[in-house]
Structures are given as structure tokens and as C-alpha cells.
């Protein structure tokens, strides 16, 4: 985008719903409550009473898989599994973890995020900026520690003398073992799941996200060296299309993978 035509910084100033990109935090909460990567859970039709009405979440592909593992539920981004997890674990626990990861959740009011749909499927009231979502994923990439984003690491003068150092705060959000297991699960998103188009050909982990009406598409991912987020969307929040084709999170993943390959050209491959 041309800054002269539009000075809006979409990385830091525009909030959009994260969709399924919120799910790793739900699954992390599940691990903390005793679930394991191979724990069985049934992908089936479920109904919940929400604001006096029955709500039945749908899977993006319209099918039900029966009994699957927790990992498969994340890798294939199964909505019914995410909703069941929030309902079982408890809205308050998932809400707290999302807040600790840095998501700007709305706690009260007519519209708030203390509900199954906002927490399980990412239909957040205010949404998130790409920077906020990237920062939330640092809890997975940094073994449970959330890193505060900084615009610079150091400032030097013309002679190389240090003038100022960027302060990067960090705090523990997840136990080390939870972050480790989440990374292993999220690696499979890129090798056999919804993010396979973004596989950069080296160890990487991440998650896709798409919102209702195909108005926003996300991919948030990381390697041992770098974490990056791709957001696709229009300023008027209209559906994503290009050349008559619908764009989705697969396209976001593909762009992410291309960036990672270029950014890490010549960097030795290493595992998590």
C-alpha cells in the first residue's frame, strides 16, 4: 500500500477477527487441563444454548470425522472440537489464557468475548491487529514465554557506539512442556493440515485462520529463527477475491512460506 494514499498502518492499527488462528490457545489450555496430543475427542454435531437460542457450530468442510485425536482436531481446524474443549475446560480459563497471551478481549458489556464462539472460533468483539496476534504466538515459539514486541533492538551512532537499547520484556504464560507439545502439533499443520501450502521445506509450525464470509485470512507461523504473520483483508471488510478467485487462509499460508524461504536463504536448517 502507498503511505501517501493511505497512512493507516494495517499491521498495528487495524483489528480484525482472528478466526481459527485463535485455536492454538484453546488447545494449549486443554493440555494444561490434562489432555494430551493423542487424547481422543469426537468430532460430532453439538448444540449449546447461547443467549436463549440453540447454537450448532459447523465445520468448514461440512463433515464430521467421528473419534479423532486432539492433534488431528487442531491440524484439520475442526470447529466442533474447539467448541467442545472450551465448553469442557471452562470459558473463564480459556479467556484468562488468551488475555495472558496478549489478545485484547472484551470482558463485559452487551457484546463481549466471554463466550464459546469468540474463544473457540475467534469471533472476537474488537478483533486483533497482526502485531498482537504475532505477539500472542511468541508463547509457543519461545517455550512458554511471551515477548513484548519492540520496534528496534539497538540504536548506534555513525561510529557504532550504542546510544539506546530496545527493552524487550518477557513473562511466562505457558509451562515449557505445553509450548513444546503445541509446537509439535502445529508442525503438522504445515506438513499434513490446513497450512500445507505454506510448508517452507524446513522445520516450521503455524496455524491458519479464516473469518465468516471470507473477509479475513490469516497465517501465523514460526521457525526456530523467526516468527511472522500474514493477514489478507480489504479495508472495507469485503470478501477476499482476486481475478475472480476466492482467497483464503491457504493463500496466506503460501505467502508466509514464500517469505520464510526468502528470509532464511543461506541460514542452516535446524529443528525446534
Question: Which residue stretches match the model-derived regions?
Answer:
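A penicillin-recognizing enzyme superfamily signal
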Residues: 1-12, 17, 22, 72-76, ...
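Short, solvent-exposed beta-strand edge segments and adjacent coil->beta transition regions
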Residues: 13, 80-82, 116-118
Amino acid at each position: 500500500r502507498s503511505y501517501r494514499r493511505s497512512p493507516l498502518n494495517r499491521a498495528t492499527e487495524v483489528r480484525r477477527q482472528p478466526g481459527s488462528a485463535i485455536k492454538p490457545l484453546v488447545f494449549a489450555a486443554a493440555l494444561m487441563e490434562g489432555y494430551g496430543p493423542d487424547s481422543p475427542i469426537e468430532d460430532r454435531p453439538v448444540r449449546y444454548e447461547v443467549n436463549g437460542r440453540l447454537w450448532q457450530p459447523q465445520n468448514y468442510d461440512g463433515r464430521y470425522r467421528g473419534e479423532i485425536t486432539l492433534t488431528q482436531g487442531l491440524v484439520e481446524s475442526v470447529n466442533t472440537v474447539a467448541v467442545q474443549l472450551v465448553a469442557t475446560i471452562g470459558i473463564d480459563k480459556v479467556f484468562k489464557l488468551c488475555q495472558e497471551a496478549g489478545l485484547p478481549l472484551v470482558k463485559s458489556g452487551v457484546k463481549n468475548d466471554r463466550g464459546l464462539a469468540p474463544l473457540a472460533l475467534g469471533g472476537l468483539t474488537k478483533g486483533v491487529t497482526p502485531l498482537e496476534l504475532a505477539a500472542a504466538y511468541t508463547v509457543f515459539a519461545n517455550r512458554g514465554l511471551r515477548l513484548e514486541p519492540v520496534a528496534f533492538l539497538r540504536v548506534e551512532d555513525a561510529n557504532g557506539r550504542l546510544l539506546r537499547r530496545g527493552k524487550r520484556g518477557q513473562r511466562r504464560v505457558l509451562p515449557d512442556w505445553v509450548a513444546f507439545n503445541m509446537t509439535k502439533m502445529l508442525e503438522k499443520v504445515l506438513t499434513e493440515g490446513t497450512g500445507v501450502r505454506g510448508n517452507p521445506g524446513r522445520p516450521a509450525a503455524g496455524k491458519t485462520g479464516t473469518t465468516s464470509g471470507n473477509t479475513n485470512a490469516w497465517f501465523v507461523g514460526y521457525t526456530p529463527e523467526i516468527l511472522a504473520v500474514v493477514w489478507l483483508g480489504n479495508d472495507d471488510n469485503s470478501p477476499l477475491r482476486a481475478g475472480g478467485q476466492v482467497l483464503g487462509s491457504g493463500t496466506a499460508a503460501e505467502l508466509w512460506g514464500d517469505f520464510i524461504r526468502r528470509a532464511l536463504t543461506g541460514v542452516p536448517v535446524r529443528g525446534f
